[in-house]
A protein has these predicted regions:
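Exposed beta-sheet edge and beta->alpha loop/turn motif
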Residues: 66-145, 194-198
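SH3/SH3-like beta-barrel superfamily modules
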Residues: 191-224
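SH3-family beta-barrel domains
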Residues: 157-178, 192-195, 204-205, 227
Length: 227
């Protein structure tokens, strides 16, 4: 089924409230809107002091695995502190009803079934088109504003620090992540490393992967999840 735009008022309201709370760094409100907001999630929000607000939120949906559940693609304009131009962005979320019948964001990175479904839906042609459109919009915004360009470059350097780290360096896993036998998203999962865990860098893996040691075992973790 094709992407629907702002089709479900309750879902729109939930997503808007969630991103408004993120802009305010209102952890308590975010906890009420999700079924799980752990210490790593909290740190991610409170540490993102450079984010002032999420504006112009548009909610795109696809059916979830069950009735009354949805895969959500939220597009927005990100307002950074002291930067006038806004940066287009897109996030994927999973929304479902809780026991009392109200919609919440299902925020459990260890839910393999949902994770697999989210990956599958992202391959849909209309979703790929949306992702490309937002990427194009972001690139245009960056090219037309020097301040935004400089800021995004700085952010990119920060997130690539794990790739620049020396072998033997200690890195911290940013959120629960799969520890895989090979540098491939289809490879066997040896373990799930909890967010906040420190691991030792063994070597740079193929593009986008870092080989690390965890519990005396060597395996691969996505570079984006390490700092």
């Amino acid at each position: 089924s094709s992407l629907e735009k702002n089709a479900y008022p309750e879902v729109n309201s939930l997503i808007n409230s969630f991103y408004e709370a993120w802009g305010r760094k209102d952890i308590e409100q975010m906890k009420q809107l999700t079924d799980n907001l752990d210490a790593v999630d909290e740190a991610k929000v409170t540490n993102s002091t450079y984010i002032e607000s999420y504006n112009d939120i548009t909610v795109y949906t696809k059916p979830g695995l069950t009735d009354d559940s949805y895969v959500v693609y939220a597009s927005y304009k990100l307002k950074f502190t002291d930067i006038k131009a806004e940066a287009p962005g897109l996030s994927q979320l999973y929304v479902m009803k809780n026991e009392d019948g109200s919609y919440i964001i299902h925020n459990d990175s260890s839910d393999e079934k949902i994770n697999a479904y989210l990956q599958k839906v992202t391959q849909d042609e209309d979703v790929q088109k949306l992702v490309s459109q937002v990427e194009d919009d972001l690139n245009s915004a960056i090219e037309s504003d020097e301040d935004l360009k400089a800021f995004e470059e700085q952010l990119g350097q920060d997130s690539n620090s794990s790739a620049r780290a020396e072998e033997g360096a200690t890195l911290t896993v940013q959120e629960d992540c799969n520890f895989r036998a090979e540098a491939d998203t289809e490879a066997e999962i040896l373990d799930v490393i909890p967010g906040g865990t420190e691991v030792t860098k063994v070597a740079d893996g193929p593009e986008g992967w870092i080989e690390v040691e965890y519990n005396n075992e060597k395996g691969f973790v996505s570079q984006d999840l390490l700092r």
